[in-house]
């Protein structure tokens, strides 16, 4: 059981040595990437509604020992964005972008860290990398929540269907128009999820103004909502029990630190992880909800550092 961390406001401060760059994808799109620190590379993959800055409280605690690479997925933050809802921006699409980023910025296989959308992307990076025989196949995977195909009808059982209404709402142009109607509607909508999904309700507040700024355009709304439109077929197949555990299982060393109080990706779903991963350890953040990385950044940093040190020793 992970230790309980005292309440403190997370540090979203951008350090002086933080750098920003744009990486061009093979099709010409630009991916924005923020980088800080030096040492072994860690690539962080965010969720919705987030962008690279969501990782800063964690990166501030890791940057003295690790090179923290924090991209904005296509459609998010400062990366290029679509000008309409799209149905092809699924986990495979984003995983391909992350693998391109790794090839361009990492000298050896990095550890990937993710949650929410990022957890789907990391699983795809593992399966895609295995199929393609990538020379930069991830060295390890760290998750702060990790839904898998095995979750199945749990998505709609035990009242959970009431939590996932937004996933269908985001499929529509109506959602884009209503949410993006004004700066106030954007704030009301996004803050609802930040507050509802957090156990530490104050943790997101230092992040809020910059988050709202990045979601202030219709293109940014399209970008985020396109994930849900693109993932919808896979989501419905999962709920119907038509998606089976990975075969073969993901073999990369993996670890999960799941927020005990996550209301949308429930921590009891961790029981399905061993059906999909050959080598995975599971711990729980007892005072976190959905956003472990900024609700309990010290705990998250200790977790990342411990796992990387362990994997390095085992591989050496």
Question: Which residue ranges define each predicted feature?
Answer:
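Typically the conserved alpha-helix immediately C-terminal to a functionally engaged Cys/Sec
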Residues: 57-61
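Active-site machinery of serine-nucleophile hydrolases
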Residues: 63-72
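Flexible "cap/lid" subdomain of the alpha/beta-hydrolase fold that forms the substrate-access gate
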Residues: 2-24, 29-31, 41, 49, ...
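Short, hydrophobic alpha-helical segments
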Residues: 304-316
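Conserved hydrophobic "DFG−1" position in protein kinase catalytic cores
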Residues: 33-35
């Amino acid at each position: 059981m992970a230790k309980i961390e005292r309440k403190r406001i997370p540090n979203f401060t951008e350090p002086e040595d933080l750098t920003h760059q744009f990486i061009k994808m093979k099709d010409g799109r630009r991916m924005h990437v923020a980088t800080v620190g030096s040492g072994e590379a860690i690539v962080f993959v965010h969720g919705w509604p987030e962008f690279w800055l969501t990782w800063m409280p964690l990166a501030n605690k890791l940057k003295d020992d690790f090179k923290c690479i924090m991209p904005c997925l296509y459609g998010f933050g400062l990366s290029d964005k679509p000008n309409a809802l799209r149905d092809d921006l699924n986990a495979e699409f984003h995983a391909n972008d992350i693998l391109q980023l790794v090839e361009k910025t990492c000298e050896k296989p990095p550890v990937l860290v993710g949650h929410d959308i990022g957890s789907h992307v990391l699983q795809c990076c593992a399966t895609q990398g295995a199929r393609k025989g990538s020379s930069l196949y991830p060295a390890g995977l760290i998750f702060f929540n990790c839904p898998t195909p095995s979750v199945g009808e749990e998505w709609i059982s035990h009242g959970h269907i009431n939590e996932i209404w937004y996933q269908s709402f985001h499929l529509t142009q109506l959602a884009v128009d209503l949410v993006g109607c004004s700066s106030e509607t954007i704030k009301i909508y996004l803050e609802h999820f930040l507050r509802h999904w957090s156990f530490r309700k104050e943790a997101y507040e230092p992040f809020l103004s910059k988050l709202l700024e990045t979601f202030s355009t219709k293109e940014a709304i399209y970008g985020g909502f396109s994930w849900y439109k693109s993932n919808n077929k896979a989501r419905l197949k999962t709920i119907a029990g038509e998606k089976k555990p990975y075969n073969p299982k993901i073999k990369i060393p993996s670890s999960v630190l799941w927020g005990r109080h996550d209301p949308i990706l429930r921590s009891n779903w961790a029981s399905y992880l061993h059906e999909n991963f050959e080598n995975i350890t599971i711990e729980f953040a007892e005072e976190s909800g959905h956003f472990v990385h900024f609700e309990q950044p010290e705990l998250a940093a200790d977790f990342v550092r411990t796992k990387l040190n362990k994997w390095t020793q085992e591989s050496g």
